[in-house]
Amino acid sequence: MGGRRPAFLFAIVALVAGVAALVAVVDLNQPGSAKQASPGSRLGVAPRSPASSTTSTSPPVTTTTADPGSLPQTNQLPSASTPAFQAEMAALWAGVVSDSVPAALPAFFPEAAYVQLKAIYSPQTDYTNRSVAEFGLDVGAAHQVLGSNPGSAGLIGVVVPQQYAHWVPPGTCENGVGYFEVANSRLVYEQDGQIHSFGIASMISWRGTWYVVHLGAVERSTEQGVVEDPEAGEGSSAPSSTC
């Protein structure tokens, strides 16, 4: 008996060591083990931090619309039936009803186009001090035609005599660029159950769109607003070769 004890003890020690090794292997596969690989690293990618799990958004895409006046002229004859022209006339009418030049300006010839068009000294100054100033006087005069209750007047439409539209070549009327011109269009409106109208003295083209360049008069003898040919009914448009 005494000679077998070392072998017996050795067997017990070996058994205990084997159990300990088995426990260690099982422990490595338990959730939360320090040795456990994350799903991300098992896929060959770095695990994402909590912050990176939020949805990222790209900067909003912005679009810019170029000022048509900054672009070169074309020889396209404008149409009076386009949404752009109708929007211009709605702006013009809103300016007349409210006696507001800023409200009406979208219908007026663009400043950048005017600078390209005019072959004169300081076209910017002429645009502001003469063209827009006269336009403002005429908007105010048309507002007065609507009487004490201008808000009761509603725009019906604008009659453009396309048959009278003509090309004005470069070098005419101190202009360095050619354009189409049409005179004596009629702005038609209804007020108190009656149809009325007044004229738009001159519109000229830029890149295939009509713009007002003279509302009440092409030429004037006084610094006062002018209303062109106010009439009951739709009125009529006379041909003109003005530039």
What are these regions (language model features)?
Residues 2, 18-20, 234-235:
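Extracellular/periplasmic juxtamembrane helices and adjacent flexible linkers that interface
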Residues 2-14:
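N-terminal Sec-pathway targeting helices
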Residues 122-196, 243:
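Surface-exposed, charged secondary-structure patches
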Residues 93-101, 106-114, 140, 144-147, ...:
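Sec-exported extracytoplasmic/periplasmic mature domains
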Residues 169-243:
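Low-complexity, intrinsically disordered terminal/linker segments enriched in charged
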Residues 20-42:
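C-terminal region of N-terminal signal peptides and the immediate post-cleavage residues
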